[in-house]
């Protein structure tokens, strides 16, 4: 019985072991040893990498600050970039506002120059001194000021009074002469010139208070009449020498004189 059982072979029997039993155990032991060695190597690498990161220092290139982690350095650099962007924006705004203010001041200067009659002319310098009132114009705080220009009203020269021609009789004294207005059809004689005598009448002009009208004496033996504007060679047809009336068409018919008495 016992011998038959041994021949059948039981797995617990050490005398009846298979031939490959020892090889399997050796292989399993070698695989477990290799896996444990690899795991130890990975842990060593991790531990060495942590030591390297802990010992490295990161420095900022803007303010020379040092950080232990790269994440902290990145946040710090972002702040520096934001500050630089705000500075550039402020500079651009200042330039834009400065150009706008200068353009507005130039437009005001040109508009005022046009109103003062100096359109198209260049604006004068902002500083000016005037002798009479002691006024000094200048820019305050970079804002130019317009100099004061003395504006003098244009006075037209006084026009001379219109010349009126008058007719005077020569038989009456100068104080009793009565001038008669007569429309001027010919240019008046210049001032300070002795009026010419035509027949028994004197053609003159308006004189001032200081001037004296001196009539030349009439011709001794001349009883003919003439009218202003009529030819001197022959008397006009409407003149009657017998009764001494001057019937001119110019409105001098009311001045009558007796020729016979004068002769």
Curated annotation (Swiss-Prot):
GO biological process terms, semicolon-separated: cell differentiation; floral organ development; negative regulation of cell population proliferation; specification of carpel identity; specification of stamen identity
Annotated region (Disordered), positions in chain: 1-51
Domain of life: Eukaryota
Tissue: Expressed in leaf primordia, inflorescence meristem, rachis branch meristems, floral meristem and floral organ primordia.
Molecular function GO labels: DNA-binding transcription factor activity; zinc ion binding
Annotated keywords: Developmental protein, Differentiation, Metal-binding, Nucleus, Zinc, Zinc-finger
InterPro entries membership: JAGGED/SL1-like (IPR045320), Znf_C2H2_sf (IPR036236), Znf_C2H2_type (IPR013087)
Position of the signal peptide: none
Name of protein: Zinc finger protein STAMENLESS 1
Originating species: Oryza sativa subsp. japonica
């Amino acid at each position: 019985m016992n011998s038959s059982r041994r021949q059948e072979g039981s797995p617990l029997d050490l005398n009846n072991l298979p031939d490959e039993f020892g090889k399997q155990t050796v292989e399993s032991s070698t695989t477990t040893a290799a896996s444990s060695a690899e795991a130890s190597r990975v842990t060593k690498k991790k531990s060495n990498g942590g030591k390297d990161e802990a010992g490295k220092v990161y420095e900022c290139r803007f303010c020379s600050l040092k950080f232990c982690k790269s994440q902290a350095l990145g946040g710090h650099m972002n702040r520096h970039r934001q500050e630089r962007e705000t500075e550039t924006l402020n500079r651009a705004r200042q330039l834009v506002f400065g150009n706008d203010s200068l353009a507005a001041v130039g437009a005001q200067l040109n508009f005022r120059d046009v109103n003062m009659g100096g359109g198209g002319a260049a604006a004068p310098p902002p500083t000016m001194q005037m002798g009479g009132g002691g006024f000094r114009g200048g820019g305050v705080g970079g804002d130019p000021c317009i100099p004061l220009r003395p504006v003098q009203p244009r006075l037209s020269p006084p026009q001379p009074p219109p010349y009126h021609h008058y007719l005077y009789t020569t038989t009456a004294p100068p104080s009793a002469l009565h001038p008669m207005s007569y429309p001027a059809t010919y240019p008046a004689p210049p001032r300070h010139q002795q009026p010419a005598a035509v027949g028994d009448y004197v053609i003159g002009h308006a004189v001032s208070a200081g001037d004296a009208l001196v009539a030349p004496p009439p011709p001794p033996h001349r009883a003919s009449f003439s009218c202003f504007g009529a030819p001197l060679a022959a008397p006009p047809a409407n003149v009657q020498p017998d009764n001494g009336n001057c019937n001119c068409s110019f409105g001098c018919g009311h001045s009558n004189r007796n020729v016979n008495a004068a002769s």
